[in-house]
Amino acid sequence: MIVRSFKEFEGTDRHVKSASGTWESTRIVLAKEKVGFSVHETILYAGTETSMWYANHIEAVVCTKGDAELTDRETGKTYHITPGTMYLLDGHERHTLKVKEDFHCICVFNPPVTGREDHDENGVYPLLTEEV
């Protein structure tokens, strides 16, 4: 059994800030735990817009605080995301999150991430493996 407090991750390599400056993420469960998924608490900042495409991962997101507009870039459809709303990127959809109010969410990835990932120029997380 693993029990963790978010406070223990402050100032460690499990607390990641994006190169773009639009988000920060606490990587709670990673590939090295060998449970088949990873879990993150992520905050996207108000007034930012982040385009993403998880070509190598499936992601489920649950909003716990904040307000954002999610756009499916393949269909053009938009969704208002507020606390208690979940979205699942089960088709590797290219999407953009336009944040109106700091957006706090819990994210689950499969396959699990290592914690070193950041979005590339296409908004993709590379498929990294755990270093041995």
Curated annotation (Swiss-Prot):
Gene Ontology molecular functions: ectoine synthase activity
Entry similarity comment: Belongs to the ectoine synthase family.
Known catalytic reactions: (2S)-4-acetamido-2-aminobutanoate = L-ectoine + H2O
Lyase as UniProt keyword: yes
Gene this chain is encoded by: ectC
PANTHER family: L-ECTOINE SYNTHASE, PTHR39289
Lineage: Bacteria, Bacillati, Actinomycetota, Actinomycetes, Kitasatosporales
Keywords for this protein: Lyase
HAMAP family (UniProt xref): Ectoine_synth
Pathway(s) of this molecule: Amine and polyamine biosynthesis; ectoine biosynthesis; L-ectoine from L-aspartate 4-semialdehyde: step 3/3
Function: Catalyzes the circularization of gamma-N-acetyl-alpha,gamma-diaminobutyric acid (ADABA) to ectoine (1,4,5,6-tetrahydro-2-methyl-4-pyrimidine carboxylic acid), which is an excellent osmoprotectant.
Name of the molecule in the record: L-ectoine synthase
Top EC group: lyase
Highest taxon in the source lineage: Bacteria
Organism: Streptomyces coelicolor (strain ATCC BAA-471 / A3(2) / M145)
EC code(s) of this entry: 4.2.1.108
Disulphide-bonded residues: none
